[in-house]
From Swiss-Prot:
Subcellular location: Endoplasmic reticulum membrane; Lipid droplet
Record-annotated membrane-spanning stretches: 37-57
Stretches in topological domain Lumenal: 1-36
Coiled coil residues, start to end: none
Domain PNPLA intervals: 947-1113
Biased composition (Polar residues): 1314-1331
Catalyzed chemical reaction(s): a 1-acyl-sn-glycero-3-phosphocholine + H2O = sn-glycerol 3-phosphocholine + a fatty acid + H(+); 1-(9Z-octadecenoyl)-sn-glycero-3-phosphocholine + H2O = sn-glycerol 3-phosphocholine + (9Z)-octadecenoate + H(+); 1-(9Z-octadecenoyl)-sn-glycero-3-phosphoethanolamine + H2O = sn-glycero-3-phosphoethanolamine + (9Z)-octadecenoate + H(+); 1-(9Z-octadecenoyl)-sn-glycero-3-phospho-L-serine + H2O = sn-glycero-3-phospho-L-serine + (9Z)-octadecenoate + H(+)
Phosphothreonine found at: T1281
Active site: S980 (nucleophile), D1100 (proton acceptor)
GO cellular component, one term: lipid droplet
Name of the molecule in the record: Patatin-like phospholipase domain-containing protein 7
Motif DGA/G in this chain: 1100-1102
Length: 1349
């Protein structure tokens, strides 16, 4: 029995095992049939359930149909009105209780209702529709050039007249009758292929314009080979303005090395230069204007191209002496020698020195020498006396009578010459009265060792008499050089100066220049090298030669420095006095201009045939994509836009070019077809350098090749540093990339402001902006009233259009930026403002409805190519900006916008005189660099300062402290952006205007992040991420509410990683909280955010660019301050060989006696892989020259240490001042606040012909070309060597400013000479009087002695 009991369990176990194995086997064999059976059962159950549901629904519907119909009652109208009336009254009665809160019941009811609504929203998942910026294509006028070229057929003038007018730049300055008088002399010439137009040896007396066919201009080298420097196509011309000047001055010369021949059968228009002489005989004043234009062309076109861009200096000037024999001085000197032999008591050892004058406190000083037995009392003049009188006679910006007196002259040729030279013509009586009181004194000594003499001769013996005789003799020789036969023209207008060795007579860049005529000694002319601070000697001015006449004729700044390396005496004629002489005798310019031409080298004469000076109308294409690259262009004035056409036919803005930029140089040097189409944004003036001329220059001066290589390399490097790879370059201040705009406008010359409506305080806005711009450089504000005061009431008439354009171009030359204030209606002045503007500011009031104004509708209907920016003004105490999207959506022509918080005075209702009086006081104070107007000024001039905040979790709390330190250090922020936590902190900074509010809101969010309850409630099943993101979304949306990025005070951007397109995204529009949340979406913790625009998935921007300084740079920032708070990876890892065992790692980790190893786990490896691109980008940013990198010591804090907010914030605040102090000591802060254009148009300092572009400046630093040695230096080496040995003991850098010594100073004034009166810093920008025409004249500046440190 026991045995059976033992067997049964075993049998049962065996049976169970067999059944289970059989079941498994059956399931394996019939798995497919089992699945089909299950599906069938499920379908049957579903059909049964649907049938039952249909049955019950049918029963209910049938019962409803069988029920009796209920009668429908109709409300009477009176009952309906009473019903709704009672309902409204019930609402009204409960409203006061809700507002005042007399009882707790209404409040409790409101709270309950709010909770129910929020619960319903969560359950039903209602999504709020945020306003979005509508993507629009740019207007055709922005990216497309006019298809119509120079139209000859539709013009009422003959084609030959149009061709001549279009090509010969000087002819455009003639009035219509004068031009038609010249056209009478034109002759048609038919040429066969190979036939020469002119050859070497023939007289150079003609202007040729090709009507059809093609000419070749050749230059013969020293070895006899001919080089084609220019191909002349129909409509182009062959002429040299220097040759025209030779004909006018009566010094005709033959062609020496230049020839022209017909490449194909051609028809040429021939105009003899002698035709100009007949016109000048009838209209003498026109002579002055034409000579001035030729001189301007020489300085602005020829010297700009050859010196600034090709690095040539001594090669441009003729070192040989051009002096005339000083016969009169020699005869006087001979008599003086005979008189000196009579006795030593009549000898004067040297002229009075500055120390002798400084040692006296009286109005007279005894001038004595060791050999002088008798002393004479010499009255000292006031330093500022007569220069004040001269400036008062010339008129200031506020002198209306001076404007009225000069209205008639301002529109004449002589008046235009005065305007270019920045001299207001005054009447003969004014000049005579100002000089009448000066004729009584004999010898006047000034602190700069300058002697002035009266017209009446002195007969008394002694040193004064002999010096007076030398002065009169030198004046006679000067009359001979200037070809004047009336000595009275120089009476009271010439000063005789003696300067000691080492004196700098005039500095490079001086505006007020004198004509100097050397009598004894020698003046050395130096020019600063473009790649260093060293000077190179251009030529020597010997006795009998002039210097400084080119700057006087053109009104441009002086191109070189004039220095006396040994004692020197010379005559000086101020610019104002020379123009007075010229007003009486216009032909005086011929002799003076001829001295300039003689100083030019033969090389300049050759290149003058190849260089073209052209004017392009707005909308005209300079060249088109795919054209042959046969020349390069230099922008003299105006603005050009480069557009590239993609393969799909779409056009993209590649860049813009302003004054001084090189255009098309890359394609020309690489011999490639044009890569883009370039057209004129507004009427522009260009210099054209043909490729053949460049080839000839390279053969003659090989060092130019090195410079061209650097130009090409720096151009490519500059485009890379602009961040072209980001794909989000912008045009103004926002990376919305609505039109994918190109280079930011750091080189704007003109800005126009126009109102949306008449309610806009445009005058106050313009004055505020002018005040802010004055901190950057000289600025000029022009209004219609201002123009009528300056140029006369008829200045805006069409007949004076060219003269007005010329005058406005001169203002661009001498000012950093010109601000045009348009009228509120479409007047001729408003049209002129739009036509002249590089950028148009459309000014509106932020609290008004975003309706279109009258002027805006006109902008939309006309093809205005200048970029338009929307400026919204807000009151200080008013609400924050809102509804910006509506403003932008209604204005498709706006490429950007800015919000300005204006002081109360902007909106004050004051009359114009009171407004001017108020701003007169305001202009006495420096502008606030933290104001919104200063921010606008920096953005317009390309000096914006950007702040970029990196990602790093809780370590980003240190950025709050750094923001406080920035404000205390006085560093303004114009653009802000960031990644991850940096995007959050940057958004707070862009929205709030006070640090305390930023800290409060940031701390509130940090406390939410430390809430454990909210974190647990946000957990979800980790398929995509550990958290659902609901709680995180609510924490961010509670901070920013419904704020849009467009409504922020500062231009702002956030960086995200688009994992759909595998690219970086830059967000500058849309819901603020949404893109801040997207930028903080860490992989694995938060799900990607779906972009409502295109549905792309957005993740944390730190994976691709954790410190986006390059993006801020592409938005137009000059300097980027980058705050890095990212974690630093461990780099000291264990080298474990070729294989790694996880068991070995486990043993090392658990064994307390084993040596610890540093090996990454899988999560760390994945994290480092994700941040590989970010680390590379960070290294590029840290090594860039535009970025100032700052990293606080926050490595000890972890990513989620939000509970230590105060501690981390304090670390940032303590570290900020330490870093900023280093910036102050090293000069970084000063450089940060300076204008980016080093050669800006300063009235007091610095050279300005045309400022170079940024890449050219870099090339000038890199390229060091050894100058070719010239004969002038070799000739002087015999005596210069021993003289240079004595120079250290001499104040070599003494700079005597003689710019206003051409007028005798009144000896009766009681002002005493004082060193404190004289010096004015040459490096500090001075507010130009023209920049604020209504202010009183404060430009009082007399003779001074300048000693640089």
């Amino acid at each position: 029995m026991q045995k059976e009991e033992d067997v049964c369990p075993e049998a049962g176990y065996c049976l169970g095992t067999a059944l289970s194995s059989w079941g498994l086997h059956f399931m394996e064999e019939h798995s497919q049939s089992t699945m089909l059976m299950g599906i069938g059962i499920g379908v049957l159950l579903t059909l049964a359930f649907v049938g039952l549901a249909a049955f019950f629904v049918y029963r209910k519907v049938s019962r409803f149909r069988r029920a009796e119909p209920i009668p429908q009652y109709r409300f009477r109208k009176r009952d309906k009105v009473m019903f709704y009336g009672r309902k409204i009254m019930r609402k009204v009665t409960t409203l006061p209780h809700t507002l005042v809160g007399n009882t707790a019941a209404p409040r409790q009811r409101v709270r309950k209702r709010t909770k129910v609504l929020s619960l319903a929203k969560r359950i039903l998942r209602f999504k709020k529709e945020y306003p979005t910026l509508q993507p629009k294509e740019p207007p055709p006028s922005l990216l497309e050039a006019d298809l119509t070229e120079f139209d000859v057929k539709n013009s009422h003038l003959p084609s030959e007249v149009l061709y001549m007018l279009k090509n010969v730049r000087v002819l455009g300055h003639f009035e219509k009758p004068l031009f038609l008088e010249l056209c009478k002399h034109m002759v048609f010439v038919q040429l066969q292929e190979g036939e020469h137009v002119f050859q070497p040896g023939e007289p150079d007396i003609s202007i040729y314009v090709v009507q059809d066919g093609r000419l070749e201009v050749c230059i013969q080298d020293a070895d006899g080979t001919e080089v084609v420097v220019k191909e002349v196509l129909p409509g182009d011309s062959v002429h040299s303005l220097l040759s025209i000047l030779d004909v006018i001055t009566g010094h005709t010369a033959p062609y020496k090395t230049v020839s022209a021949r017909a490449a194909v059968a051609s028809t040429v228009l021939w105009l003899p230069a002698a035709a100009f002489q007949g016109v000048f005989e009838k209209y003498p004043e026109t002579l002055v204007r034409v000579v001035q234009i030729i001189m301007v062309r020489l300085q602005r076109v020829t010297f700009l191209a050859l010196h600034n861009y090709l690095g040539l200096t001594t090669e441009l000037f003729n070192p040989e002496s051009q002096a005339i024999p000083l016969l009169s001085v020699a005869s006087v000197a001979g008599r003086a020698k005979r008189q000196m032999s009579y006795g030593p008591e009549e000898q004067l050892e040297r002229s009075p020195r500055l120390s002798e004058f400084n040692s006296s406190d009286q109005r007279s000083v005894a001038v004595s020498g060791p050999l002088l037995k008798r002393s004479c009392s010499v009255p000292l003049p006031p330093i500022h006396g007569e220069i004040d009188e001269l400036r008062q006679a010339q008129g200031s910006g506020s002198n209306t009578s001076a404007f009225q007196e000069s209205q008639e002259g301002a529109t004449s040729d002589l008046g235009m010459a005065y305007n270019r030279a920045r001299i207001l013509p005054h009447s003969e009586e004014q000049l005579g009265s100002s000089l009448a009181s000066k004729s009584k004194k004999s010898v006047v000594a000034e602190t700069s060792a300058v002697f002035h003499y009266s017209e009446k001769p002195r007969d008394e013996p002694g040193p004064s008499g002999r010096t007076d005789a030398i002065f009169r003799a030198a004046t006679k020789d000067l009359l001979t050089l200037m070809k004047l036969d009336d000595p009275s023209l120089l009476d009271g207008r010439v000063a005789f100066l003696h300067v000691p060795a080492g004196t700098i007579v005039s500095k490079q860049g001086d505006q007020d220049v004198n004509i100097l005529f050397v009598v004894s000694g020698m003046l050395h002319v130096y020019q600063q090298k473009i790649d260093s601070l060293e000077d190179t000697c251009l030529f020597l001015t010997h006795p009998g030669e002039m210097v400084g006449q080119l700057a006087v004729l053109t009104g441009e700044p002086l191109m070189f420095t004039i220095r006396a390396n040994r004692d020197c005496s010379f005559l000086s004629i101020s610019k104002a006095h020379f123009y007075e002489i010229m007003r009486k005798r216009p032909d005086v310019v011929l002799g003076v201009a001829h001295t300039v031409v003689r100083r030019m080298s033969s090389f300049v004469r050759q290149i003058d045939f190849a260089l073209d000076w052209m004017e392009v109308e707005a909308g005209r294409a300079i060249y088109r994509q795919g054209d042959k690259s046969d020349c390069t262009y230099i922008v003299l004035s105006g603005r050009l836009r480069s557009v590239i056409r993609k393969d799909d036919g779409k056009k993209r803005l590649a860049g813009e070019y302003g004054r001084g930029d090189l255009v098309g140089v890359v394609e020309m040097l690489t011999h490639q077809a044009r890569a883009t189409t370039v057209h004129a944004v507004r009427d522009s003036e260009l210099a054209k350098l043909p490729a053949g001329a460049l080839t000839s220059i390279k053969r003659r001066y090989p060092q130019v090749v090195t410079r061209l290589i650097h130009l090409l390399g720096e151009k490519i490097l500059g485009s890379l540093q602009q961040g072209s790879g980001t794909g989000h370059q912008l045009g103004f201040n926002t990376a919305s990339s609505k039109w994918d705009l190109g280079n930011p406008p750091g080189n704007l010359s003109t800005v126009a402001a126009m109102p949306v409506s008449e309610d806009v305080p445009l005058t106050a806005f313009a004055l505020e902006l002018q005040h802010a711009l004055s901190a950057i450089g000289p600025v000029l504000l022009l209004t219609s009233d201002n123009i009528k005061q300056r140029l006369g009431s008829a200045a805006l008439d069409s007949i004076h259009e060219y003269r007005l354009s010329s005058w406005l171009g001169q203002q661009e030359d001498i000012h950093r930026i010109v601000l045009y204030q348009a009228d509120s209606t479409l007047t001729p002045w408003t049209q002129r403002c739009i036509r002249q503007a590089d950028c148009i500011l459309i000014v509106g009031l932020g609290d008004q409805e975003p309706a279109l104004g009258e002027l805006e509708q006109m902008l939309e209907s006309t093809a205005v190519r200048a970029q338009k920016q929307l400026i919204l003004l807000h009151k200080e105490e008013g609400p924050a900006p809102s509804r910006t999207v509506e403003w932008l959506n209604m204005r498709s022509w706006c490429s950007g916008h800015l919000h300005l918080c204006c002081p109360r005075r902007v909106f004050s209702k004051r009359s114009l005189p009171k407004l001017v009086e108020m701003y007169t006081r305001i202009f006495q104070r420096p502008p606030d660099r933290h104001s919104d107007f200063s921010r606008l000024a920096r953005i317009l001039t390309g000096n914006a300062i950007a702040l970029v905040l990196g990602g790093g979790g809780a370590r980003g709390c240190a950025q709050v402290g750094i923001l406080r330190a920035l404000a205390e250090c006085g560093i303004p922020v114009d653009i802000i952006g960031g990644t991850s936590i940096g995007a959050f902190m940057g958004a707070l900074f862009a929205e709030e205007r006070s640090y305390s509010q930023i800290r409060i809101r940031a701390k509130q969010w940090a406390e939410d992040m430390t809430s454990m309850v909210k974190t647990i409630l946000d957990l979800t099943y980790p398929i995509t991420s550990m958290f659902s993101g609901t709680g995180f979304n609510s924490s961010i949306s509670n901070i920013f509410k419904d704020r849009q990025i467009e409504d922020l005070w500062l231009p702002y951007f956030a960086i995200t990683t688009d994992i759909t397109a595998s690219a970086m995204r830059v967000h500058t529009d849309g819901a603020l909280w949404r893109y801040v949340r997207a930028s903080m979406s860490l992989s694995g913790y938060m799900p990607p955010l779906c972009d409502p625009k295109d549905g792309h998935l957005l993740m944390d921007g730190g994976y691709i660019n954790n410190l986006p300084a390059d993006v801020a740079r592409s938005m137009g920032a000059k300097v980027v301050i980058a705050i890095d708070v990212g974690s630093r990876d461990e780099t000291d890892l264990t080298n474990y060989g070729d294989a790694l065992s996880g068991w070995w790692l486990l043993w090392k980790r658990w064994n307390p006696l084993a040596t610890k190893v540093k090996v990454l786990n899988m999560a760390e490896i994945q994290t480092r892989l994700a941040y590989v691109c970010c680390v590379r980008q960070l290294e590029m940013v840290k090594n860039s020259d535009y970025c100032e990198y700052l990293r606080p010591p926050i490595d000890s804090y972890r990513t989620l240490d939000f509970g230590k907010f105060d501690e981390i914030c304090e670390v940032g605040y303590q570290h900020g001042p330490a870093g900023f102090d280093i910036w102050v000591r090293s000069g970084v802060l000063e450089k940060m606040l300076q204008d980016q254009q080093g050669t800006s148009k300063r009235m007091d300092c610095g050279v300005f012909t045309c400022p170079n572009s940024s890449f050219t400046d870099l090339a000038e630093i890199v390229s060091r070309i050894e100058p070719a040695k010239v004969a002038a230096v070799d000739d002087e080496s015999d005596y210069q060597t021993e003289y240079e040995e004595e120079l250290p003991a001499i104040p070599k850098e003494t700079y005597a400013d003689f710019q206003s010594t051409g007028i005798e100073l009144d000896s009766d004034s009681e002002c005493e000479p004082s060193m404190s009166q004289g010096p004015h810093s040459l490096t500090s920008p001075k507010q130009s009087q023209d920049s604020f025409p209504w202010l009183p004249n404060q430009d009082d500046q007399g003779p001074r002695l300048y000693r640089p440190s």
